[in-house]
C-alpha cells in the first residue's frame, strides 16, 4: 500500500486503496464514498438498517462524511471566500512546489508548469462548487485538497483533487 503525503507539511492526504485517476499528469482525482461510522465500525450510506443490529439506545459517537476525509483526518478549510484569495494561495503554493521539484525532480518542472496552468484554469472555473481540505496539521501553507461532488451513474460522488507534484509516496 502507498500513502501519499504533503511534501510541505508531511500530512497524510490519501492512500492507493481508493479509485485514483491521474489528470494531465498533475492532478490526482480520488473517488470517495459517503460513510457513517460508530467508533471503529464503518457503515456505507444507504445500507439496509433493518439488516443491522438493533440500536441499544446508548449515546455513541457517530461521524459521517467522505471516507478519504475521515480516514486520513483531513480538515475542512474555510479560508477561501472568493476566487481571488484562492488564486493568491495557489500562486504561493506553486512557488513552493516548484522549488521542491527543481531540487528533487528537475525533469518534472516543465510538465508541472505547462499542465498546471491548464488545471488551474479548469479548477478556478468551478470554484463555487468546491470544498477545501487541509491535512491534519491544518497548515494552509501546505496542500489544500479540493472536493467536488460529481454526478456519476445517477449518484453524487465526492471526488477529491490533489496536486501530484505536491505529494510524496511512502510505501507501507
Swiss-Prot record:
Gene3D superfamilies: Metal Binding Protein, Guanine Nucleotide Exchange Factor, Chain A. Involved in calcium binding and microtubule stabilization. This is Translationally-controlled tumor protein homolog. Coiled coil: none annotated. Residues 1-172 form the TCTP domain. The keyword Calcium applies. One of its GO terms (cellular component) is cytoplasmic microtubule. It is found in: Cytoplasm. GO terms for molecular function: calcium ion binding. It comes from Drosophila pseudoobscura pseudoobscura. Pfam families: TCTP. Belongs to the TCTP family. Keywords: Calcium, Cytoplasm.
